[in-house]
Design a protein with these regions (language model features):
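Short, glycine-/small-residue-rich phosphate/pyrophosphate-handling segment
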Residues: 109-152
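A short secondary-structure junction signal
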Residues: 91, 129-134, 161-163
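Short, solvent-exposed coil/turn elements at secondary-structure transition points
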Residues: 38-40, 124, 153-156
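A short beta-to-alpha transition loop/helix N-cap that caps and shapes the active-site region
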Residues: 41-44, 127-129, 158-160
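Active-site rim beta-loop-alpha module in soluble metabolic enzymes
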Residues: 154-159, 165
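Short, surface-exposed loop/turn motifs that are enriched in glycine and acidic residues
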Residues: 122-126, 162-169
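N-terminal beta1-alpha1-beta2 submodule of the flavodoxin-like/Rossmannoid cofactor-binding fold
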Residues: 1-109, 148, 170-242
Length: 242
């Protein structure tokens, strides 16, 4: 199997350690590709809309995004990690996710995404990790992923692993290993189930794209939906099973 990891920081702190513990269960049976932000996607999205209007290859940062996109599409499991900064994911993670706006269901979602699983790992000193995880989940779910595991925690005492109490270290280790075992025992030869919320999103966007495509057959998103057969009877979660 293939695992693609997007690290929201280059720092090797508590989040990094938790990620390493999660991956330990997979190291003998998976090809793991990791990206570190901002190094592997260093620039901000400038909102030019080229990706949505002209195609993702016209993005000024295509040299970075195309490589990562390929890894994401080839992955059976996507792991996204980020420490919590002021109740949110890192700025580098937000900048990364902005580059993939064209992959949202209202635009040109990849059918492969609808059969994938994903895991989000985040923590913080105090509160805020849940809202940070929500930042990432928002994009993953709008990419079409239904099966998303989430690990969050409030450290409270310190942000350095070695300075945490043994009790806290044991608690974090136990929880992340439990999540790892859960995802390690999945049969990745079978696509994940697409939930009703995701299907509803597709249904709503299909009506929108059908109307737009009728009035402007050359509009990129509408053409994509038509080519995929989604304006007819085909659906993204059926496409990726074929």
């Amino acid at each position: 199997m293939n695992i693609t990891v997007i690290n929201g920081t280059e720092k090797h702190g508590v989040t990094y350690r938790l990620k390493e513990m999660f991956l330990e269960e997979f190291k003998d049976k998976a090809n793991i590709t990791e990206y570190y932000l901002p190094k592997d996607c260093p620039n901000f999205c400038v909102g030019c809309l080229n990706c949505t209007l002209k195609g993702e290859k016209t993005c000024k940062d295509a040299e970075y995004t195309e490589k990562i996109d390929k890894s994401l599409l080839e992955a059976d499991l996507i792991v996204m990690t980020s420490p919590t900064y002021v109740f949110h994911a890192t700025g580098a993670m937000k900048a990364f996710l902005d580059h993939f706006a064209y992959r949202w269901i209202p635009h040109r979602p990849a059918p492969e995404m609808f059969g994938k699983r994903a895991v989000i790992i985040t923590q913080c000193l105090g509160s805020g990790s849940k809202s940070a995880a929500k930042d990432i989940k928002h994009s993953l779910s709008w990419w079409g992923i239904s099966k998303i595991g989430i690990f969050t925690d409030a450290l409270m005492s310190d942000i350095v692993w070695e300075k945490l109490s043994r009790k806290k270290q044991a608690e974090l280790t136990g929880r992340i290993q439990k999540l790892s075992r859960k995802f390690a025992h999945i049969d990745y030869t079978k696509p994940a189930h697409t939930n009703l919320i995701t299907r509803f999103k597709v249904f709503f966007c299909r009506m929108m794209q059908k109307s737009i495509h009728k009035s402007d057959p050359e509009y990129l998103d509408g053409k994509y939906w038509a080519e995929q057969g989604w304006l007819g009877k085909n659906r993204p979660w059926r496409t990726q099973k074929m």
